[in-house]
């Protein structure tokens, strides 16, 4: 079901699209993770020792061993990370399965294993594991990039890349002292875009943007700091920002959204072309994406796309990436009988923000099944936009589409532990139902008080 036909050593863009396949060149990416519960899963039974002996027998190097209380069966479960290139892992897996009541394989490099689930982060700190696997690094610019022949700009890009590369979850977001030239570039973009927002941006965007001006220093002569913006978003919807040096693979980027984490660049486009950038920069992130991550309905919609991606086969990752492109990046919606822009690619581009509401592009209703297989250009204005009636209806349609993804489990984000729960057993479902019942009782109590 999950078998990949082709693997790439590094994140690789597929054809002329925004879809980027993750790479497996680093040692950690080639490891195989095993999650299992021995038939006798009490810690005192010696069951784990027996299973570890199996790995030793087949010369498997284990790089991580973790025990935890199981939500699937009474007792404990174990999470083991094995070096996929050592020993006879296939034979070891067959022997371990015989000793277990529950067994699951999770692998980053799964092209030769049709039974493996593509690896995905379970805890928010797991985002550290792929945050630096990007399409290009720092000063590595394409020959047609405006800053390709500018040594100072390339040096500056490396500075930003190093900041992101060294960041770990839980640390304060790095403060950046932007240069006068960088602030002037930001100012040109800010000044032009804000002229169009009242007439072209959606209602939710125009509600949040003044709050960013008041609370986060959004103004023409100042580039906001990610830490200030992230704290603001956390208070609004629980979304946070995380610095990244460049484009992540589609699978890794979407996985961040499942935790309400948005990977954001801090560098800015080259000053020679302030109204153009061939890649996401801090202007695109802050002017385009950030305002709507402060809206509860849009935040939930974005997280649903992320949750749908966890453990999904490659072809569905491409579909979800395309849905993201036509919504979060280039989405248009209907409000009070008029078309308004809500996609970040539109809200951070003066030219395309003007263009998208004219009669030049084609418009179609947003339907994930159709949207997810639509081809699109990445170096010119979009000839087609998908129109959503509301973020709420877009979310419901996306959830329905996610139910068609062939994976043998459901997922749920636990905001208390900032972790993803894999729902694949009756005890887990029962526990979830108890939680829902408790929330429903709170709702009933609140409604009763409103009636008094």
Swiss-Prot record:
Which E.C. number(s) belong to this protein? 1.14.16.1, 1.14.16.4
* Keyword annotations of the record: Allosteric enzyme, Iron, Metal-binding, Monooxygenase, Oxidoreductase, Phenylalanine catabolism, Phosphoprotein, Serotonin biosynthesis
Is Metal-binding found in the keyword set? yes
Matching entries from Gene3D superfamilies are given as: Aromatic amino acid hydroxylase (1.10.800.10)
Phosphoserine modifications at: 272
- One MF term in the entry's GO annotations: phenylalanine 4-monooxygenase activity
Report the superkingdom from the record.
Eukaryota
Cofactors needed by this protein, per the record, are: Fe(2+)
ACT domain sequence ranges: 36-107
Q: Could you tell me in which tissues this protein is expressed?
A: Phenylalanine hydrolase activity is found in yolk granules of embryos, and female abdomen and fat body tissues. Tryptophan hydroxylase is expressed in serotonergic neurons. Both enzymes are present in cuticular tissues.
- Pfam families the UniProt entry points to: Biopterin_H (PF00351)
CDD domains named in the record: ACT_AAAH, eu_PheOH
Q: What NCBIfam families does the record point to?
A: Phe4hydrox_tetr
**PANTHER family cross-referenced by the UniProt entry:** AROMATIC AMINO ACID HYDROXYLASE, PHENYLALANINE-4-HYDROXYLASE
**Other facts:** In Drosophila, the 2 enzymes, PAH and TRH are found to be encoded by the same gene. Preference for the substrate is probably due to post-translational modifications such as phosphorylation, or by changes in the N-terminal regulatory domain.
- State what protein this is by name: Protein henna
Gene that encodes the chain = Hn
């Amino acid at each position: 079901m999950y078998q990949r036909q082709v693997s790439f050593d590094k994140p690789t863009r597929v054809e002329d699209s925004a879809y980027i396949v993750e790479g497996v060149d680093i040692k950690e990416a080639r490891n195989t993770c095993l999650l299992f519960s021995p038939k006798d899963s009490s810690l005192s039974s010696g069951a784990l020792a027996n299973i570890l002996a199996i790995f030793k027998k087949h010369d498997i190097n284990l790089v991580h061993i973790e025990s935890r209380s199981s939500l699937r069966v009474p007792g404990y479960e174990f999470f083991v990370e094995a070096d996929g290139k050592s020993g006879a892992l296939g034979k070891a897996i067959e022997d371990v399965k015989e000793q277990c009541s529950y067994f699951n394989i999770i692998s980053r490099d799964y092209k030769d294993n049709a039974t493996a689930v593509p690896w995905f982060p379970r805890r928010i700190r797991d985002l550290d594991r792929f945050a630096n696997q990007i399409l290009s690094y720092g000063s590595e610019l394409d020959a047609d990039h405006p800053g390709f022949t500018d040594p100072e700009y390339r040096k500056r890009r490396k500075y930003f890349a190093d900041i992101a590369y060294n960041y770990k979850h839980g640390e304060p977001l790095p403060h950046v002292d932007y240069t006068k030239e960088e602030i002037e570039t930001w100012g040109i973009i800010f000044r032009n875009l804000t002229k169009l927002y009242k007439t072209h941006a959606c209602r939710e965007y125009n509600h949040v943007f003044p709050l960013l001006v008041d609370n986060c220093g959004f103004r023409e002569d100042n580039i906001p700091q990610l830490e200030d913006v992230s704290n603001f978003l956390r208070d609004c919807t629980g979304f946070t920002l995380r610095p990244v040096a460049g484009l992540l693979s589609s699978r890794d980027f979407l996985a961040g959204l499942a935790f309400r984490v948005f990977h954001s660049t801090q560098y800015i486009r080259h000053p020679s072309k302030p109204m153009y950038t061939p890649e996401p920069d801090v202007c695109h992130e802050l002017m385009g994406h950030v305002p709507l991550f402060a809206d509860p309905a849009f935040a939930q919609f974005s997280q649903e796309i992320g949750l749908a991606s966890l453990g999904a086969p490659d072809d569905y990752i491409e579909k979800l990436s395309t849905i993201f492109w036509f919504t979060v990046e280039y989405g248009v919606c209907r409000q009070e009988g008029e078309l308004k822009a809500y996609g970040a690619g539109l809200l951070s581009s003066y030219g395309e923000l003007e263009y998208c509401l004219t009669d030049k592009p084609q418009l179609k209703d947003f339907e994930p099944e159709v949207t997810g297989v639509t081809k699109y250009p990445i170096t010119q204005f979009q000839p087609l936009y998908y129109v959503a009636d509301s973020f709420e209806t877009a979310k419901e349609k996306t959830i329905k589409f996610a139910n068609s993804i062939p994976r043998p489990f459901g997922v749920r984000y636990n905001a208390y532990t900032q972790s993803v729960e894999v729902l694949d057993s009756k005890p887990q479902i029962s526990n979830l139902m108890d939680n829902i019942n408790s929330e429903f009782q709170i709702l009933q109590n609140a409604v009763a008080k409103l009636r008094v």
